[in-house]
């Protein structure tokens, strides 16, 4: 019975407030990768949205979930660490550098 309780505790989805904090971490990480809120890459809304979408898809693929609020509690710490280290793809990084360098030229 204790095994069942432990299993349920670890497999239970995270609290909605924790899911919200993960979304905030994602936003902060993506904005930082884009070069900040004043960067041309962030100002290009269509491009910025695609980077946010890429980040979301990467996260959901990594944890094999369809929605943030379905993340099992046992992965809560790993999810936080994920957003601290997430990086866009190489092609996306090159586009960010191109957009941000263009404004400095």
Regions found by a protein language model. Name each.
Residues 1-105:
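A general nucleic-acid interaction/assembly signal
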């Amino acid at each position: 019975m204790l095994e069942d309780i432990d299993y349920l505790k670890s497999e239970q989805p995270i609290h909605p407030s924790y899911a919200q904090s993960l979304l905030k971490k994602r936003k902060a990480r993506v904005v930082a990768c884009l070069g900040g809120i004043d960067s041309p890459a962030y100002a290009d809304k269509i491009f910025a949205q695609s980077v946010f979408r890429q980040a979301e898809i990467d996260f959901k693929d990594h944890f094999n979930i369809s929605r943030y609020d379905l993340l099992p509690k046992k992965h809560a710490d790993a999810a936080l660490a994920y957003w601290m280290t997430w990086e866009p793809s190489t092609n996306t990084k090159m586009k960010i550098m191109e957009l941000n360098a263009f404004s400095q030229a």
